UniProtKB/Swiss-Prot annotation:
Belongs to the complex I subunit 4L family. It catalyses: a quinone + NADH + 5 H(+)(in) = a quinol + NAD(+) + 4 H(+)(out). This is NADH-quinone oxidoreductase subunit K 1. The gene is nuoK1. InterPro entries: NADH_UbQ_OxRdtase_chain4L/K, NUOK/Mnh_C1-like.
Length: 103
């Protein structure tokens, strides 16, 4: 029976990270797609952290992955809240319109 090794985890993480990067570079008009691509990249990083944690028999990578998941959830919630407020004020969430915001 074949065992799933470190190389398999790293390959899946590399594909996910590449898809997230392509999602950011190829779609610059929709902010929600950009946020989803960033979350996909963070998921790939978490897979790497957990894979190396298991491979090295150390729990620090898994703890750090939980920390990254917590921060990513907070980042997504704040980002979506800002988008909802912006959509209510402007009626659009296009990236070129967001560049007009002044603080």
């Amino acid at each position: 029976m074949n065992e799933i090794g470190l190389g398999h985890f790293l390959s899946v993480a590399a594909v996910l990270f590449t898809l997230g990067t392509l999602g950011i570079f190829l779609n610059r008009k929709n902010v929600i797609i950009i946020l989803m691509s960033i979350e996909l990249m963070l998921l790939a990083v978490n897979i790497n952290l957990v894979a190396f944690s298991i491979y090295l028999n150390d729990i620090v990578g898994q703890v750090f992955a939980l920390l990254v998941l917590t921060v990513a959830a907070a980042e997504a919630a704040i980002g979506l809240a800002v988008l909802v407020v912006f959509f209510r004020n402007r009626g659009t969430i296009a990236v070129q319109d967001i560049n007009l915001m002044k603080g």
